[in-house]
């Protein structure tokens, strides 16, 4: 009996501290919102066998497919605060955050034919309230896209016509499915990992 209890504690400890949860599925509601908004498919993987090489300080990288969801990246990630950046961020640093199981919300600003301000504000509220979520403008999104959700080697992009409700439905489901999971090579460990994501 004693050995069974010890084995149980060891198994529980492994689950709580070492096992990283796998990625989930985006909800049917999120997929329906994406279809109604005219979004592209959920891309996974974005690139086969992405590199995880750290670039030298100050070194840039020309990602062949943007916004980049994986690949060579800066040795330093973006700081977790602020969660919402008012200006574009260095893409090489953002990719490093993705490697650590963050989700990034990129958008084209309204002044550049992108998302309306209500949608931006509502997405920013989600980013501020969630750990391991960063939001920043990304003016270089493809011409027909104004909103992108990224996790490591995972991307979902939508046009500017997406409504605030559709964007919120997609973002919350995407965050739940991919943040802090083993889809990222350097995700936090253990089922308790998400408790420390803020």
Model-derived segments and spans:
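Short linear sequence elements within intrinsically disordered, low-complexity coil regions
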Residues: 8, 19, 66-68, 112
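Surface-exposed, low-hydrophobicity interaction/linker segments
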Residues: 24-26, 30-93
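Intrinsic disorder/low-complexity signal
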Residues: 17-25
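Helix-rich interaction surfaces within compact, conserved domain-sized segments
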Residues: 25, 125-198
């Amino acid at each position: 009996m004693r050995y069974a209890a010890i084995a149980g504690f060891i198994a529980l400890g492994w689950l709580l501290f070492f096992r990283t949860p796998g990625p989930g599925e985006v909800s049917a509601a999120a997929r329906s919102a994406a279809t109604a908004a005219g979004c592209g498919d959920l891309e996974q993987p974005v690139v086969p066998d992405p590199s995880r090489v750290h670039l030298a300080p100050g070194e840039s990288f020309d990602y062949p497919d943007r916004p980049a969801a994986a690949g060579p990246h800066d040795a330093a990630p973006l700081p977790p605060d602020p969660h919402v950046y008012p200006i574009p961020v260095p893409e090489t640093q953002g990719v490093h955050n993705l490697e650590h199981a963050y989700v990034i919300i990129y958008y084209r600003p309204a002044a550049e034919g992108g998302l309306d301000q209500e949608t931006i504000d509502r997405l920013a509220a989600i980013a501020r309230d969630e750990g391991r979520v960063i939001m920043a403008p990304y003016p270089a999104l493809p011409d027909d896209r104004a909103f992108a959700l990224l996790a490591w080697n995972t991307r979902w992009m939508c046009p500017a016509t997406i409504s605030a409700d559709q964007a919120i439905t997609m973002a919350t489901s995407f965050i739940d499915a991919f943040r802090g999971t083993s889809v990222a090579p350097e995700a936090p460990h253990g089922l308790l990992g998400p408790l420390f994501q803020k």
